[in-house]
Amino acid sequence: NFTVRGRVIDAYGEPLIGATIREKGGANGTVTDVEGNFFLSVPDSAVLQISFVGYESQEVSVKGRSMLEICLKENILLLDHVIVTALGLEKKESSLAYAVQKVRGEELNRVKEVNMITALAGKAAGVQVSKNSSGMGGSAKVSIRGVRSVAGDNQPLYVIDGVPMLNSTSEQAYSAIGGTANAGNRDGGDGISNLNPEDVESISILKGAPAAALYGSQAANGVILITTKKGNTVGRRDIHFSTGLTFEKAFSLPEMQNSYGVSDVTDSWGEKENLTVYDNLGDFFRTGLTSITSVSVNSGNDKLQTYFSYANTTGRGILNENKLSKHNINLRETAVLFNSRLKLDGNVNVMKQTVKNKPVSGGFYMNPLVGLYRFPRGEGLSYYKENYERYDEDRKLNTQNWHTFTEDFEQNPYWIQNRIQSKDARIRLLLSLSANLKVTDWLTLQARGNLDYSADKLRQKFYASTATALCGMNGRYIEMDYQETQMYGDVMAMVKKQLN
């Protein structure tokens, strides 16, 4: 063997980045670099097969040459985009009767997001994506072609590699655990946020009624198809490492008046005064920070492909004590047997996540914004920040310290942050296996099975003197455990035959 060096270009002399070069009849192969260059060790009698998406493949005999320049011609027929459609089947975009948009995985990962689906914002026409106001670990709201229901669910159906995903949002009302409707809701997160965005190859968004026909009423709001990565077939091992930091700040704060002082209970404001201006709102929020680090190993050949990835996510929200830690492990094996007639594909995806002190959305009792907005203008909050509790001689314990005793309406926001503590833990397991058998040149059979299991635990502590309407005089301790399991399977026969 000797090393042959080459360069792959197009008709205009521009380098083709990522073109595949393989030794004919063997597993030896490589891809071109950013300059279109490649190096490959082959026998002097080897024949190289060069291919690139949208171009005609070419075979070149080495014949002992150490330097090659290969020019590929465009193939207009191959330039038609291939789209993953319903049930994970691939078709040319021009053959579809409904609207489809495709977003590549590289576009999703330009900005690191804890919830991968929020990275879709601004990348697909007609798709509206917004983060929930519940801080780290919260769910995302996605609507395709506008909101269809005012009170109902507008979320699309998520399908991973052809299998529908369990994407329930575990929003918990405090009224369900003995409180009242004024306590607000806790967002327990959604299923799609459990995925590692680095594992995503592409996302296809299906719009219109025909796109959702195969999935029934659960896809009434559209379908988001996620195709995950596999091992490569060029006989090399690629290791990819990435890390990113994201900073967050409160986007918009209300403008507060600074001309009128404190009123009595019956008036909205008091006398006009020359007030000292304090930035109590700005001081309450901090700069959020999210760190996402991932590593993946991609290897394989014509017969066996392997993809492995690990990702670690840590973050702190814009509210103090709101923290997140998440670990993702993914292993995918693909085997091609019996002269490419049988293809087996297996995937194991495990996620472990812990979120501390999720803030609530809405309500009075557990919402720190109520106390912040109603705090007297012209007074600073620093005293109540440092002294959010005081010792009660009668009860012989520390109780909440606040400028008013109307705890049925508002509480010290720093007491809420430090003395209402919660911990949400989730473990999620996704198992999938598929077999594809080419029976004849025109008949292919496919069988798939999937298991989606999640286990959630909530631990929450309300210290004594927290709003008695919710917690009583002595506080409250809550434990909640719940599990969800979804099993899915299908068998398909695909016929591809020319009818005269």
Residue ranges and their predicted role:
Residues 9-10, 414, 437:
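Short, Lys/Arg-rich amphipathic segments at extreme N-termini
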